[in-house]
């Protein structure tokens, strides 16, 4: 049997000076977006979940202005105040987001996005700041031109407003181009490196070759690999047909045969990749915080991995046909 992982082992984020645990927590669900996830999250649930996160050994929390149109950040800000500040050596990450009305994403919008986040979170700087979803900008030239939004991101780093900068997006082709032109400390990919999809594999390898740390978010394909396809019939934020869920059910069958949780296998599949610094798991209840930490170190027999090696997986973009719903 392969040695179990520990969720709280820490990994350096390149040369940034930051270290994060092998598992991080995500807060998209805490933005209360039932159209995206299929369920709502109350203020009380969010409060209890964030208190559990701050009390846990996990030291990294990922959020965005885009999660519930600022609702996730508002809830995190309240939790930070209730906690008397962030825990020691805690790495909070947020993202620069475009103007949600116009999709404008120039330098002034990038600056304003950070100002909005810092004000909402109640802090004066952020450990990790990602540039979020450039593919949805009204003009990619506003993002990449001289004096554009990405230049502004690195300017804010030089001003000490953040310690490390990253790129968090969906489209890996755009990300591949940008990592060749800008010295990101970190890249964040989501839903594109799971036990049933390896679309982001080439991006992850390219980042490793450049010394860029990689966060892999949504190892459960937006929830189905954790909650089970029998009751959660969604895949990558959309309702899913039996055909779409077939690869998930093939994995579930192997896990059931060996008596191991599919969620633990899905999480550790990501953790086994040495080119991934941390795996981001969304949490919306305190018990999910505890469960994630347990799954990270759940003993999984070698026979499971051997059998799963023959299960088919996709390399297509799993969000290619997704109908995007803002916030």
Regions found by a protein language model. Give the residues of each.
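N-terminal binding-site loop/beta-alpha segment at the start of enzyme catalytic domains
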Residues: 1-90
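Beta/alpha (TIM)-barrel catalytic core signal, keyed to glycine-rich beta->alpha loops juxtaposed to Asp/Glu
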Residues: 2-10, 134-315, 319-327
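Conserved, mostly hydrophobic/aromatic
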Residues: 13, 25, 61, 76, ...
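Structural preference for beta-strand elements that scaffold enzyme active sites
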Residues: 20-24, 59-60, 89-95, 125-130, ...
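Active-site mouth loops of central-metabolism enzymes
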Residues: 31-44, 96-109, 141
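Short, acidic/polar
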Residues: 39-53, 105-120, 171-177
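Acidic-and-aromatic substrate-binding clefts and catalytic sites of carbohydrate-active enzymes
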Residues: 64-73, 99-104, 137-138, 193-198
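Active-site groove signature of glycoside hydrolases
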Residues: 118-139
């Amino acid at each position: 049997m392969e040695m179990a992982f520990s969720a709280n082992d820490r990994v350096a984020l390149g040369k940034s000076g930051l270290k994060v645990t092998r598992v991080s927590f995500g807060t998209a669900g805490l933005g209360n977006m039932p159209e995206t996830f299929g369920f709502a999250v109350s203020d009380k649930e969010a409060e209890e979940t964030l208190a559990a996160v701050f009390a846990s050994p996990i030291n990294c929390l990922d959020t965005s202005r885009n999660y519930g149109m600022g609702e996730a950040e508002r809830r995190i800000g309240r939790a930070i105040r209730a906690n008397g500040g962030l825990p020691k050596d805690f790495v909070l990450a947020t993202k620069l987001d475009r103007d949600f009305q116009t999709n404008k994403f120039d330098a002034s919008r990038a600056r304003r996005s950070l100002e909005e986040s810092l004000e909402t979170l109640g802090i004066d700087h952020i450990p990790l700041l990602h540039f979020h979803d450039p593919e949805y900008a009204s003009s990619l030239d506003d993002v990449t031109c001289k004096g554009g939004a990405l230049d502004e991101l690195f300017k804010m780093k030089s001003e000490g407003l953040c310690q490390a900068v990253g790129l968090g997006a969906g489209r890996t082709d755009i990300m591949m181009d940008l990592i060749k032109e800008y010295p990101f400390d970190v890249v964040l990919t989501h839903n594109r490196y799971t036990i049933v999809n390896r679309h982001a594999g080439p991006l992850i390898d390219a980042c490793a070759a450049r010394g860029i740390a990689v966060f892999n978010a949504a190892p459960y394909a937006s929830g189905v690999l954790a909650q089970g396809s029998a009751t959660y019939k969604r895949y990558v934020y959309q309702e899913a047909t039996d055909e779409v869920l077939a690869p998930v059910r093939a994995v579930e069958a192997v896990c059931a045969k060996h008596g191991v949780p599919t969620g633990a296998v899905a999480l550790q599949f990501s953790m086994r990749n040495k080119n991934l610094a941390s795996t981001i798991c969304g949490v919306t209840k305190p018990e999910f915080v505890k469960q994630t930490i347990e799954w990270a170190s759940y003993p999984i027999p070698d026979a499971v991995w051997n059998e799963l090696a023959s299960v088919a997986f996709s390399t297509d973009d799993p969000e290619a046909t997704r109908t995007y719903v803002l916030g």
